[in-house]
């Protein structure tokens, strides 16, 4: 006998913050290179531009993960040396995904970085969705730790 699992849409958000012992300018240089994601995000094999624009609103990147899954992301907001916001248009089991990476100097040598996102799933079970949320949270945390290590060298 198979159990009938009810599938529906789910919504959640993730917010992860880390303190980095590096100047705001150094942190911004690293994160604002949107095709440089593979230098600090875990399980990212490569990131390529899909647009002529490399920075600011309208820049588009394609992320290829080590398992060969891909995600397409479009920058939709940008404030130099403060934040950028992007949406995923392909590659996730979601109907909507918007994320912002922002920085705030705490002093000349320490910067607070926050990565937060909101998402709404395609139809899936609650258990599947919670697994996805856990995976995304771990991806953010481990990637931010990598970023911190690379900037504090």
Segments from the language model and where they lie:
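A conserved amphipathic terminal alpha-helix motif
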Residues: 112, 119-153
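Short, P/G- and charge-enriched loop/turn segments at secondary-structure junctions
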Residues: 2-6, 59-62, 87-89, 101
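Short Pro/Gly-enriched beta-strand edge/turn motifs at strand-loop
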Residues: 1, 43-44, 54-57, 81-87
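Hydrophobic ligand-binding cavity/cleft-lining segments
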Residues: 1-51
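Hydrophobic-ligand binding "helix-grip"
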Residues: 38, 65-110, 118-121, 149-150
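Well-ordered beta-strand positions enriched in small/hydrophobic/aromatic, beta-favoring residues
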Residues: 47, 61, 84-86, 113
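Hydrophobic residues positioned within well-ordered beta-strands of beta-sheet architectures
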Residues: 14-16, 59-61, 73, 99, ...
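Generic structural detector for well-ordered beta-strands
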Residues: 17-21, 48, 62-64, 74, ...
